[in-house]
Amino acid sequence: MGQPGQQSSHEQSNMLAAVCSISFVNLWHSKAKTYAVWCVRVVKQEEPVENTGDSQLGSPRNSNLYLVSYELLLSEKNMLPDEQLNFTSTGGDILNFMRWEMALRAKHPVISLLSRHCGNMEAVFSLQLNGIMIKGATLQTVARPPLRQACFAYMWCHAKASADEGGQHLVLDSLEATIKTKLGTYTYSNNTGEADPPSTKVARRQDQVKILDIFEPCDYVLNLGGSDVTVKLIDVPFDCLVVNDECRWNLGLNVFFSALYKKIYGGIYGFKPLFFIAEPSDLTFPTSPFFSSFPNISIEYSPNFKDFSKTMSQSSLAAILTTGDCYKVNNFLLECITGISVPPIPEALRHGTGISWPLGATELNNKLIMGDLPYVHIKHPHVLYIINFKFNTRFCCGSLSGDEIPKLLARYSTGHLKQNLNSWYSYLVFSVMNFCNLHNLQWIAFNHSMFYLASHAQDQVSTPPVAAVPFKTTNTCI
């Protein structure tokens, strides 16, 4: 492939595009000012249309990567975690930095808008560009199918490790990786424990694609505080990298990208991306590691490449959700993950619901409980109706199923979002109870979004206004 070129930030244009990934690059300090820089990868629906200005380059590269910058306020700099972070590591300090950076995203008018629709290929933006810098974004109100579909690459990665003599640390025994792209296939196998993947050691065929053909370093020039700053980022021949599901817990992907980071940035001491990984702490949800900066690409996980839905999500953001939300970013993260925006419930509905139920409540009908055990007994012949309500999300939520989304919202939402969710859930419970009264049904129990209703077997019950699956039985014990 050709030599990496440079992208300048001095040509004004407009472009229609969907956003496939947003990642942090780094902080830049200059003349007592601090700038945050984000990397935005897009799926172009129309090529940029030049307005005014001139480019510093005669033939700029056709990249899908653009940048957004933001000058920090003093209050935001004061909130920056003051620990001396190792910018190629993991841990609690890194998690605090990631959440602080997410608070910046939530405040930035462009990044916050793009983040809420990132991964949704049906959300097309009109982007106002100044070279490689995104200066403004407007969501197109007329929905239409994308003109260009996202391009996917596939990676299988596996590592084996064993404990050291002291049993305190893991030592890498082997690392294997295969990446299939439209450029060709890259294969790496290392049984020596070394993590650096230079192409001369891994090539099984002379014509095999090299790792830097797939992750191609390219210099980008942006203007920060009146000075031109160069940053090396990677161009890739895909919009999303799909990796095997075991990389959620296997350390292979972390080791591979750590080695690639050192290969590209080992000799660079200036402005460059960070290498931060947040491992999921809440194992009750099928979430994945979150790479907040390098490799600055969208990563999805799939147990079977053939059955992969070819959709993108932001479910990996769940790795940085915490119950102690000191940076007030949980609600922003949840909206990015689920695509759910919850408005306040109208006053008339809120006052008519009666009892308030928290989202995800579990309740049994006390009138049907016999004895001290929490069991409901129905002795007469009846028809059991199970109604399951699902959240109407704007786009795919990745590994999170429809049943897990309300549980995630119930656990991590705060403030007005939690209040609105609880109000709407209370109204849902009230509506189901009211429906039971109108149609001679008896409510048995509800658990999260599942409602269990019963009627006498001889009763004729009209079709509920929601999907119900009847199960006929003569004696039901829940």
From Swiss-Prot:
Q: Name one Pfam family in it.
A: Herpes_HEPA
Its GO biological process annotations read: viral genome replication
Chloroplast keyword on record = no
InterPro entries documented for this protein:
HSV_HEPA (IPR004996)
Q: Which domain of life is it from?
A: Viruses
Signal peptide as annotated in the record: none
A Gene Ontology molecular function term for this protein is: helicase activity
Indicate what this protein is called per its UniProt record.
Answer: Uncharacterized gene 40 protein
Q: What organism, scientifically named, is this protein from?
A: Alcelaphine herpesvirus 1 (strain C500)
Q: Which gene encodes it?
A: 40
